[in-house]
Amino acid sequence: MIRRFFHTMGRQDRIYKTLSEALKTDKITLYNDSYKHSHHIAMKGVPDTNETHFRLEIVSPEFSGMSRVARHRLVYGLLKDEFDGGLHALQITSSKTPDEVS
Amino acid sequence: MSVEITFVEQFQEILQNGKEQIILLNFYAPWAAPCKQMNQVFDQFAKDTKNAVFLKIEAEKFSDIAESFDVNAVPLFVLIHGAKVLARISGANPQKLKAAIDEYIQPLISQISSTNASVETQVNSVQTTNTTSNTSKAPNGLDSELNERLSTLTNAHNVMLFLKGTPSEPACGFSRKLVGLLREQNVQYGFFNILADDSVRQGLKVFSDWPTFPQLYIKGEFVGGLDIVSEMIENGELQEMLPN
């Protein structure tokens, strides 16, 4: 039952689920920007352009002591399956620790 | 002496080999009378100025190069050192051009080591590649030959941008934005269109440990994508990283 639900879950929900389960997070905000990119040359021939481009704002204490690149790599690494499966871009517009937010 | 650019790779190679030198670019159009006049002036200044590279670039023929320097009208003269644009002189104004040469080139010449290689050597030098087949793997899991190629590419210029499309025709919004940001910051950069070579496109994801494009490298070091570069510009960090 759970497995079937997971497979019918959209990419946006899967990203949210993956990040919130793998990281301690104070905040995850995920925006679907796919509609802005569906007409671009690079998207030619892509079968489903509804869930290809997302924008993320994330706050996690686990980012403490990590460089920007390391924070982004951590998030990208957790979502490797999504990138392999058709996620084209995840803009991480903010990746902060709770201390950096306050 | 001044050198006429005849192909893009020649230009990129001169920039790569001339990192320590001051380079003066002359963007011109053969049909424009002011350009004809300024080309003569430019050639004379080139003869009189030692240890600087003077390049003539036909703007319409090399639209990608012209676009990356935001050339809207000719003649346009751009003075660069490393990855930084020192001055832009627009129009047929020999006095302004001479003033820029005196202001920037003469003081800098004393600071930088003169290279033994002449411009001609730089233009004609060919990078030798190992033609023996090499199927061994690099530590990151990439084929050694591809890994070496990516290493060469990421070091091909002080600042190297890997994007979808070209600076004049970016193929995605993120690439377009990053090109715009670099232009605003007057950053001179080399670029590679990853859509033209899938082995580079896929290989660079592993090489950089970064799954998306565009990707920016400075002095062979991975810096980040659009988000990180935007943040670095806001904080003034990017300018600090750029080579002098």
UniProtKB/Swiss-Prot annotation, chain A:
**Induction or repression:** Expression shows cellular growth phase dependency, with the maximal expression at the diauxic shift. Expression is rapidly decreased when cells approach stationary phase. By UV light. Expressed maximally (3.2-fold) at 4 hours after exposure to 240 J/m(2) of UV light.
Key words of the record: Cell cycle, Cell division, Cytoplasm, Mitochondrion, Nucleus
For this entry, list what GO says about its biological process.
cell division
The record's Gene Ontology cellular component field reads: cytosol; mitochondrial matrix; nucleus
* Effect of a null allele: Leads to delayed spore germination and the unidirectional cell extension is not followed by cell division. Proliferates faster with smaller cell size than the wild-type cell during vegetative growth, but no other significant cellular anomaly, such as defects in septation or cytokinesis are detected. Sensitive to UV light. Shows a normal cell cycle delay after UV irradiation, but displays aberrant septum formation and defects in cytokinesis when released from the UV damage checkpoint. However, chromosome segregation is not affected.
* Gene3D superfamilies per the UniProt record, alphabetical: BolA-like
Annotated compartments = Mitochondrion matrix; Cytoplasm; Nucleus
| Stated family | Belongs to the BolA/IbaG family.
Protein name per Swiss-Prot or TrEMBL: UV-induced protein uvi31
Q: Which organism is it from?
A: Schizosaccharomyces pombe (strain 972 / ATCC 24843)
UniProtKB/Swiss-Prot annotation, chain B:
List locations, semicolon-separated: Cytoplasm; Nucleus
GO:BP terms for this protein?
Answer: intracellular iron ion homeostasis; positive regulation of transcription by RNA polymerase II
Named from the GO MF annotations, one term is:
metal ion binding
Binding-site list for [2Fe-2S] cluster: C172
Write out the similarity annotation.
Belongs to the glutaredoxin family. Monothiol subfamily.
- Task performed by this protein: Monothiol glutaredoxin involved in the biogenesis of iron-sulfur clusters. Binds one iron-sulfur cluster per dimer. The iron-sulfur cluster is bound between subunits, and is complexed by a bound glutathione and a cysteine residue from each subunit.
Query: What protein does this entry describe?
Result: Monothiol glutaredoxin-4
Species of origin reads Schizosaccharomyces pombe (strain 972 / ATCC 24843) (Fission yeast)
Q: What is the lineage of its organism?
A: Eukaryota, Fungi, Dikarya, Ascomycota, Taphrinomycotina
